[in-house]
Amino acid sequence: MRGQIKILNKFIYVAMIVVVGFTSLGLTSNENEKKIHSNITIENIDVGKLTKKQAIKKLEAKYPLKDFYITWGNEKWAIEAKSIDLDYHIEERVNEAFNYTRDTSMLENIKRKGKLKLKKSHNIRLKATYDEIKLSKELKVICRAINVDAVDASFHVELSGEIKRTKSKEGKKVDLSRLKENIYDMINKKKIENINLPVLTSYPKVSTEQVKSINSILGQFSTSFNDSTSRGSNIHVAGESTSDILLMPGETFSYNKRTGARNWVNGYKSAPIIVGGKVTNGEGGGVCQVSTTIYNAALLSGLTIDEVHNHSLPSKYAPKGRDATVSYGYTDLKFTNPYTHPVYIKNIVGNGAITSKIYGCNLDRERISIRMIEEYTKNKITVQTYRLYLDEENNIVRKEL
């Protein structure tokens, strides 16, 4: 009996809350008036006691969908709001405000109204959206108008020996990530205004000052060959592919990388080569004479030799221990520019000879002498090649193996 009385009391209590809710909170009057409940704000703008139409008008006056400009100096580009589908979704947020005290259960609606009556306001944020793909298309137009690649300075030696230089130029590039970030921040703040175009300066990899520093021949070496043979043809091809190369400070030269595979596709013919201590025919015969010539020029120029291999048989075109055999994919000739200035490799091929010259800054020029020490055993000769650095009185100040 007591349990039934408790249930009845709870029912009466709930019923009283509902009745009080209907009367004291004025549910029916708000519903009939079709207005947003008081103390509801959108983006901290009071829309309470307004119809949806009135609220939309008020918010659109505060947050119009305006076009904006991206400016750079005297240049400017218009970005239309409609072209990027810019939208604050005001109508959706107004509907949310209108339904705040209507779209949940009766008790929850009463609870929300109670808080609003107690001056506890409810704020709804506007969410700005735009089409990123469409914006990117607009920004590409700006980038095409602004972006200019930096131009490297160049250094070239004609066959006549005449030196030609061109100057470097700085480039410019739109900082696209920063520009997009600025637009994103502006739109999210819903404060449409013009944006300054962020432009970065791009610098050339090779400057005018660097090529100006090339004013001297650091070292050179020549070898002879029969110009009228397939081997001679291969020397021409390899000599051209490894010539006119600007090697920046710290940069490494790779013979195999410059020539590529020595096959008929790259212009090489079959000619005598040394394989396993024997002379036979193979594609690219003669390329080792080019690598040997360049190697000796690099030795005399003080460049750092990273990789070099000798033939299994002595070469006719170079002293013992100063040849450089190469085999694509296996053995290579590599050296690095150790100086703070660039060096330039120039090969001159013709009239039965190939000459490799390495140009650089006269401040880097060393007095270098090459010395070979031969060691004879029963079956072979071993040659050790030393690079000697000399002072003005020809005293050895440093030597390298």
Feature names for model-found ranges:
Residues K10, A128, R165, A298, ...:
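Functionally constrained cores in energy, signaling, and assembly domains
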Residues E33-P272, G277:
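Short glycine/threonine-rich beta-strand-turn micro-motifs
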Residues Q4, L8, T104-L107, A145, ...:
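Generic N-terminal leader/processing signal
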Residues I12-G26:
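Hydrophobic membrane-insertion alpha-helices, especially the h-region
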Residues R2-M16:
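N-terminal Sec-pathway targeting helices
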Residues F22-I36:
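Membrane-interface motif at the C-terminal end of an N-terminal transmembrane signal
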Residues R2-G3, V141, D149, V157-E158, ...:
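Well-ordered beta-sheet/strand-loop patches within structured domains
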Residues I12, D87, A97-N99, E375, ...:
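Intrinsically disordered, low-complexity N-terminal regions enriched in serine/proline/glycine
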